Protein backbone atom coordinates (compact mmCIF):
# COMPACT_ATOMS: atom_id res chain seq x y z
CA UNK A 1 0.00 0.00 0.00
CA UNK A 2 1.03 2.67 -0.48
CA UNK A 3 1.31 19.40 3.96
CA UNK A 4 2.54 21.66 3.33
CA UNK A 5 1.92 24.16 5.85
CA UNK A 6 2.96 26.68 3.29
CA UNK A 7 1.80 29.39 5.61
CA UNK A 8 4.38 31.72 4.14
CA UNK A 9 2.46 31.70 0.86
CA UNK A 10 -0.22 34.36 0.91
CA UNK A 11 -3.43 32.38 0.99
CA UNK A 12 -5.29 34.96 -1.03
CA UNK A 13 -3.32 33.69 -4.01
CA UNK A 14 -5.97 31.02 -4.33
CA UNK A 15 -8.56 33.67 -5.09
CA UNK A 16 -6.56 36.39 -6.78
CA UNK A 17 -6.30 37.06 -10.47
CA UNK A 18 -3.05 35.72 -11.84
CA UNK A 19 -1.52 36.24 -15.24
CA UNK A 20 -2.22 34.76 -17.67
CA UNK A 21 -5.88 33.90 -17.18
CA UNK A 22 -8.52 32.63 -19.61
CA UNK A 23 -10.54 35.46 -21.13
CA UNK A 24 -12.20 33.73 -24.09
CA UNK A 25 -15.63 32.11 -24.17
CA UNK A 26 -15.56 28.49 -23.02
CA UNK A 27 -17.01 27.35 -26.37
CA UNK A 28 -13.95 28.75 -28.16
CA UNK A 29 -11.56 26.50 -26.25
CA UNK A 30 -10.06 23.51 -28.03
CA UNK A 31 -11.33 20.42 -26.16
CA UNK A 32 -8.69 18.86 -23.94
CA UNK A 33 -7.61 15.24 -24.15
CA UNK A 34 -9.92 13.06 -22.05
CA UNK A 35 -8.14 11.09 -19.28
CA UNK A 36 -7.68 7.37 -19.88
CA UNK A 37 -7.96 5.81 -16.43
CA UNK A 38 -6.86 2.41 -17.72
CA UNK A 39 -3.28 3.71 -17.55
CA UNK A 40 -1.41 4.51 -14.34
CA UNK A 41 -0.17 7.75 -15.90
CA UNK A 42 -3.65 9.19 -15.36
CA UNK A 43 -3.48 8.54 -11.61
CA UNK A 44 -1.40 11.04 -9.65
CA UNK A 45 -1.47 8.51 -6.79
CA UNK A 46 -2.12 4.78 -7.08
CA UNK A 47 -1.23 1.69 -4.99
CA UNK A 48 0.48 0.06 -7.98
CA UNK A 49 3.18 2.73 -8.19
CA UNK A 50 5.34 4.67 -5.76
CA UNK A 51 4.25 8.27 -5.33
CA UNK A 52 4.27 11.01 -2.71
CA UNK A 53 1.19 9.62 -0.98
CA UNK A 54 3.52 6.84 0.20
CA UNK A 55 5.66 9.24 2.23
CA UNK A 56 5.39 9.88 5.96
CA UNK A 57 6.81 13.06 7.52
CA UNK A 58 10.54 12.87 8.21
CA UNK A 59 10.10 12.69 11.98
CA UNK A 60 7.23 10.19 11.85
CA UNK A 61 9.00 7.32 10.13
CA UNK A 62 8.51 5.07 13.17
CA UNK A 63 4.73 5.37 12.86
CA UNK A 64 3.24 1.87 13.19
CA UNK A 65 -0.44 2.59 12.52
CA UNK A 66 -1.79 0.11 10.00
CA UNK A 67 -5.15 -0.85 8.54
CA UNK A 68 -6.14 -2.89 5.50
CA UNK A 69 -9.04 -3.38 3.10
CA UNK A 70 -9.70 0.37 2.92
CA UNK A 71 -9.48 2.56 -0.18
CA UNK A 72 -9.25 6.35 -0.19
CA UNK A 73 -10.43 8.06 -3.36
CA UNK A 74 -8.68 11.44 -3.14
CA UNK A 75 -9.73 14.45 -5.24
CA UNK A 76 -7.02 17.09 -5.20
CA UNK A 77 -7.59 20.86 -4.99
CA UNK A 78 -6.78 23.47 -7.61
CA UNK A 79 -3.16 23.50 -8.70
CA UNK A 80 -3.85 25.22 -12.03
CA UNK A 81 -3.24 28.87 -11.17
CA UNK A 82 -1.52 30.22 -14.28
CA UNK A 83 -2.64 29.61 -17.84
CA UNK A 84 -4.99 30.89 -20.52
CA UNK A 85 -7.31 27.86 -20.72
CA UNK A 86 -10.43 27.13 -18.67
CA UNK A 87 -9.46 23.51 -18.06
CA UNK A 88 -6.01 22.12 -17.40
CA UNK A 89 -4.27 19.82 -19.86
CA UNK A 90 -3.93 16.41 -18.18
CA UNK A 91 -0.48 16.02 -19.74
CA UNK A 92 0.86 19.33 -18.43
CA UNK A 93 3.95 18.11 -16.59
CA UNK A 94 4.40 21.33 -14.61
CA UNK A 95 0.87 21.20 -13.18
CA UNK A 96 1.06 17.47 -12.47
CA UNK A 97 4.43 17.89 -10.75
CA UNK A 98 3.02 20.69 -8.62
CA UNK A 99 0.05 18.53 -7.66
CA UNK A 100 2.32 15.62 -6.76
CA UNK A 101 4.68 17.73 -4.67
CA UNK A 102 2.00 19.67 -2.82
CA UNK A 103 -1.42 18.21 -2.19
CA UNK A 104 -0.46 14.55 -2.68
CA UNK A 105 2.61 14.89 -0.45
CA UNK A 106 1.01 17.01 2.26
CA UNK A 107 -2.66 16.02 2.22
CA UNK A 108 -3.31 12.62 0.64
CA UNK A 109 -0.36 11.13 2.51
CA UNK A 110 -2.24 11.47 5.81
CA UNK A 111 -3.72 8.06 4.91
CA UNK A 112 -0.33 6.46 4.15
CA UNK A 113 -0.22 2.90 5.50
CA UNK A 114 -3.88 3.05 6.47
CA UNK A 115 -5.48 2.77 3.03
CA UNK A 116 -4.90 2.28 -0.67
CA UNK A 117 -4.82 5.80 -2.10
CA UNK A 118 -6.29 6.53 -5.53
CA UNK A 119 -6.04 10.10 -6.85
CA UNK A 120 -7.00 10.73 -10.48
CA UNK A 121 -5.51 13.32 -12.79
CA UNK A 122 -8.40 15.40 -14.09
CA UNK A 123 -9.08 18.45 -16.23
CA UNK A 124 -9.33 20.76 -13.24
CA UNK A 125 -10.69 24.25 -13.75
CA UNK A 126 -8.43 27.29 -13.68
CA UNK A 127 -8.64 29.14 -10.37
CA UNK A 128 -10.11 32.09 -12.30
CA UNK A 129 -13.08 29.87 -13.14
CA UNK A 130 -14.41 30.54 -9.65
CA UNK A 131 -14.86 34.19 -10.63
CA UNK A 132 -16.73 33.52 -13.87
CA UNK A 133 -20.20 32.08 -13.29
CA UNK A 134 -20.71 31.34 -16.98
CA UNK A 135 -17.48 29.94 -18.37
CA UNK A 136 -16.38 28.64 -14.98
CA UNK A 137 -19.47 26.48 -14.53
CA UNK A 138 -19.02 24.95 -17.97
CA UNK A 139 -15.39 24.19 -17.21
CA UNK A 140 -16.44 22.74 -13.86
CA UNK A 141 -18.75 20.27 -15.61
CA UNK A 142 -15.83 19.03 -17.71
CA UNK A 143 -13.68 18.56 -14.62
CA UNK A 144 -16.45 16.83 -12.69
CA UNK A 145 -17.13 14.38 -15.52
CA UNK A 146 -13.51 13.22 -15.25
CA UNK A 147 -13.93 12.64 -11.51
CA UNK A 148 -17.12 10.65 -11.98
CA UNK A 149 -15.52 8.55 -14.73
CA UNK A 150 -12.44 7.94 -12.59
CA UNK A 151 -14.55 6.88 -9.63
CA UNK A 152 -16.61 4.50 -11.75
CA UNK A 153 -13.44 3.00 -13.21
CA UNK A 154 -12.01 2.62 -9.72
CA UNK A 155 -15.18 0.84 -8.56
CA UNK A 156 -15.17 -1.59 -11.47
CA UNK A 157 -11.46 -2.38 -11.60
CA UNK A 158 -9.71 -1.58 -8.31
CA UNK A 159 -12.10 -1.67 -5.35
CA UNK A 160 -12.40 -5.45 -4.96
CA UNK A 161 -14.88 -5.15 -2.11
CA UNK A 162 -12.81 -2.79 0.04
CA UNK A 163 -14.35 -0.14 2.29
CA UNK A 164 -14.39 3.28 0.64
CA UNK A 165 -13.39 6.71 1.93
CA UNK A 166 -13.67 9.84 -0.19
CA UNK A 167 -11.26 12.65 0.68
CA UNK A 168 -10.94 16.03 -0.99
CA UNK A 169 -9.95 19.65 -0.60
CA UNK A 170 -11.14 22.92 -2.14
CA UNK A 171 -12.06 22.35 -5.82
CA UNK A 172 -11.84 18.64 -5.08
CA UNK A 173 -14.52 19.04 -2.41
CA UNK A 174 -16.84 20.71 -4.91
CA UNK A 175 -16.46 17.66 -7.16
CA UNK A 176 -16.83 15.24 -4.25
CA UNK A 177 -20.08 16.88 -3.14
CA UNK A 178 -21.45 16.62 -6.68
CA UNK A 179 -20.33 12.98 -6.79
CA UNK A 180 -22.52 12.38 -3.76
CA UNK A 181 -25.57 14.20 -5.07
CA UNK A 182 -25.39 13.04 -8.69
CA UNK A 183 -24.11 9.48 -8.30
CA UNK A 184 -23.70 8.02 -4.83
CA UNK A 185 -27.07 9.06 -3.43
CA UNK A 186 -28.68 7.45 -6.48
CA UNK A 187 -26.87 4.15 -5.88
CA UNK A 188 -27.60 2.86 -2.38
CA UNK A 189 -25.47 -0.28 -2.67
CA UNK A 190 -22.39 1.83 -3.44
CA UNK A 191 -23.24 4.53 -0.89
CA UNK A 192 -23.34 1.90 1.85
CA UNK A 193 -19.69 1.10 1.13
CA UNK A 194 -18.62 4.74 1.56
CA UNK A 195 -17.80 4.76 5.26
CA UNK A 196 -16.41 8.28 5.53
CA UNK A 197 -15.92 11.45 3.51
CA UNK A 198 -13.56 14.37 4.08
CA UNK A 199 -15.14 17.37 2.33
CA UNK A 200 -12.58 19.96 3.37
CA UNK A 201 -12.01 23.58 2.42
CA UNK A 202 -15.39 24.49 0.92
CA UNK A 203 -18.78 25.24 2.52
CA UNK A 204 -20.91 22.09 2.67
CA UNK A 205 -24.43 22.28 4.06
CA UNK A 206 -25.73 19.69 6.49
CA UNK A 207 -28.37 18.62 4.01
CA UNK A 208 -26.80 15.68 2.17
CA UNK A 209 -29.72 13.27 2.34
CA UNK A 210 -28.86 9.91 3.93
CA UNK A 211 -25.27 11.01 4.57
CA UNK A 212 -25.06 13.39 7.56
CA UNK A 213 -22.19 15.36 9.01
CA UNK A 214 -20.13 13.48 11.62
CA UNK A 215 -20.69 14.54 15.23
CA UNK A 216 -18.63 12.04 17.20
CA UNK A 217 -14.96 10.94 17.08
CA UNK A 218 -15.99 7.42 16.06
CA UNK A 219 -18.90 8.14 13.71
CA UNK A 220 -18.84 6.50 10.30
CA UNK A 221 -21.12 6.74 7.27
CA UNK A 222 -20.93 10.50 7.58
CA UNK A 223 -18.86 13.40 6.28
CA UNK A 224 -16.31 15.71 7.88
CA UNK A 225 -15.90 19.30 6.78
CA UNK A 226 -14.14 22.45 7.94
CA UNK A 227 -12.68 25.73 6.66
CA UNK A 228 -9.95 27.21 8.83
CA UNK A 229 -9.64 30.89 9.76
CA UNK A 230 -8.03 32.98 12.46
CA UNK A 231 -10.24 33.43 15.51
CA UNK A 232 -12.61 36.34 14.99
CA UNK A 233 -12.15 36.56 11.21
CA UNK A 234 -15.16 36.46 8.89
CA UNK A 235 -14.47 35.81 5.19
CA UNK A 236 -16.31 37.78 2.51
CA UNK A 237 -17.89 34.58 1.21
CA UNK A 238 -20.29 32.06 2.77
CA UNK A 239 -20.62 31.49 6.48
CA UNK A 240 -23.68 30.50 8.51
CA UNK A 241 -24.82 27.94 11.04
CA UNK A 242 -26.34 25.93 8.18
CA UNK A 243 -22.87 25.02 6.96
CA UNK A 244 -21.53 21.79 8.45
CA UNK A 245 -18.29 21.98 10.43
CA UNK A 246 -16.56 19.31 12.47
CA UNK A 247 -13.73 20.39 14.75
CA UNK A 248 -10.70 18.30 13.64
CA UNK A 249 -9.18 18.36 17.13
CA UNK A 250 -12.05 17.10 19.28
CA UNK A 251 -14.20 15.83 16.36
CA UNK A 252 -17.36 17.56 17.58
CA UNK A 253 -19.62 19.85 15.58
CA UNK A 254 -20.41 22.25 18.39
CA UNK A 255 -19.37 23.07 21.91
CA UNK A 256 -16.40 24.59 23.62
CA UNK A 257 -13.06 25.21 21.97
CA UNK A 258 -10.73 22.23 21.80
CA UNK A 259 -7.94 21.95 24.36
CA UNK A 260 -4.43 22.92 23.35
CA UNK A 261 -3.24 19.62 24.85
CA UNK A 262 -5.38 17.72 22.34
CA UNK A 263 -3.60 19.19 19.32
CA UNK A 264 -1.00 16.73 17.96
CA UNK A 265 1.10 19.02 15.79
CA UNK A 266 1.42 20.79 12.42
CA UNK A 267 2.93 19.43 9.20
CA UNK A 268 5.33 22.09 7.93
CA UNK A 269 6.83 22.70 4.52
CA UNK A 270 10.07 21.00 5.59
CA UNK A 271 7.97 17.82 5.86
CA UNK A 272 8.22 17.56 9.63
CA UNK A 273 5.52 17.49 12.30
CA UNK A 274 6.19 20.30 14.77
CA UNK A 275 4.59 22.27 17.59
CA UNK A 276 2.06 19.94 19.20
CA UNK A 277 -0.34 21.58 21.65
CA UNK A 278 0.03 24.83 19.71
CA UNK A 279 -3.54 25.60 18.72
CA UNK A 280 -7.13 25.52 19.88
CA UNK A 281 -10.08 25.34 17.48
CA UNK A 282 -13.75 26.20 17.83
CA UNK A 283 -16.74 25.96 15.47
CA UNK A 284 -18.49 29.28 14.84
CA UNK A 285 -21.17 30.05 12.24
CA UNK A 286 -19.95 27.56 9.66
CA UNK A 287 -16.28 28.43 10.19
CA UNK A 288 -13.46 26.78 12.10
CA UNK A 289 -11.65 29.43 14.13
CA UNK A 290 -8.15 28.70 15.41
CA UNK A 291 -6.09 30.40 18.10
CA UNK A 292 -2.36 29.72 18.34
CA UNK A 293 -0.32 29.25 21.47
CA UNK A 294 3.05 30.93 21.24
CA UNK A 295 5.76 29.03 19.37
CA UNK A 296 9.00 30.11 17.62
CA UNK A 297 8.45 32.40 14.62
CA UNK A 298 4.70 32.18 15.12
CA UNK A 299 4.09 35.68 13.77
CA UNK A 300 5.47 34.68 10.36
CA UNK A 301 2.79 32.04 9.98
CA UNK A 302 -0.21 34.01 11.22
CA UNK A 303 -2.88 34.68 8.59
CA UNK A 304 -6.60 35.34 8.56
CA UNK A 305 -7.33 32.57 6.06
CA UNK A 306 -5.67 29.16 6.51
CA UNK A 307 -7.31 27.56 3.48
CA UNK A 308 -4.12 26.00 2.14
CA UNK A 309 -3.37 24.59 5.60
CA UNK A 310 -6.75 22.94 6.25
CA UNK A 311 -5.04 19.54 6.39
CA UNK A 312 -1.58 20.58 7.61
CA UNK A 313 -2.68 22.25 10.82
CA UNK A 314 -4.38 19.06 11.98
CA UNK A 315 -2.43 16.44 10.01
CA UNK A 316 -1.62 14.14 12.92
CA UNK A 317 -5.04 14.58 14.53
CA UNK A 318 -6.63 13.55 11.22
CA UNK A 319 -4.38 10.52 10.88
CA UNK A 320 -4.86 9.24 14.42
CA UNK A 321 -8.61 9.79 14.36
CA UNK A 322 -8.91 8.03 11.00
CA UNK A 323 -7.18 5.01 12.51
CA UNK A 324 -9.42 4.98 15.59
CA UNK A 325 -12.56 5.62 13.58
CA UNK A 326 -11.93 2.94 10.95
CA UNK A 327 -10.54 0.23 13.23
CA UNK A 328 -13.83 0.13 15.15
CA UNK A 329 -15.47 -1.93 12.43
CA UNK A 330 -12.55 -4.35 12.37
CA UNK A 331 -12.80 -4.84 16.13
CA UNK A 332 -16.58 -5.30 15.89
CA UNK A 333 -16.13 -7.99 13.25
CA UNK A 334 -13.59 -9.82 15.40
CA UNK A 335 -15.99 -9.75 18.36
CA UNK A 336 -18.95 -11.12 16.41
Regions found by a protein language model. Name each.
Residues 17-100, 104:
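Flexible, membrane-associating and regulatory peripheral segments of lipid-active enzymes
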Residues 22-28, 75-161, 295-309, 316, ...:
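Active-site catalytic motif of lipid deacylating hydrolases and related acyltransferases
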Residues 68-70, 113-117, 160-163, 192-195:
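Loop/turn elements at helix/coil->beta-strand transitions in domains of secreted/extracellular proteins
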Residues 71-75, 118-121, 165-166, 196-199, ...:
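Structural recognition of the beta-strand scaffold that forms the well-ordered cores
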Residues 168-172, 176:
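Gly/Ala-rich beta-loop-alpha elbow adjacent to hydrolase catalytic centers
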Residues 175-184:
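Short glycine-enriched nucleophile-adjacent loop
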Amino acid sequence: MKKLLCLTLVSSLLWSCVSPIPIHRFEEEIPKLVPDYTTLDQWIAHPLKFDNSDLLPKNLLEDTLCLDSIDVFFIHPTTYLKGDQWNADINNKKINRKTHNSTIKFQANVFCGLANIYAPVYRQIHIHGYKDNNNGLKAFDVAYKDIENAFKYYLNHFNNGNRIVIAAHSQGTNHAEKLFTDFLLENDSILQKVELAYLIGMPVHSLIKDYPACDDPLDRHCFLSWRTFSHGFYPSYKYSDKIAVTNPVNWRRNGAASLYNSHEGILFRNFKIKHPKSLSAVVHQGLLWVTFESFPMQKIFEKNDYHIADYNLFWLNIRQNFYERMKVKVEDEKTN
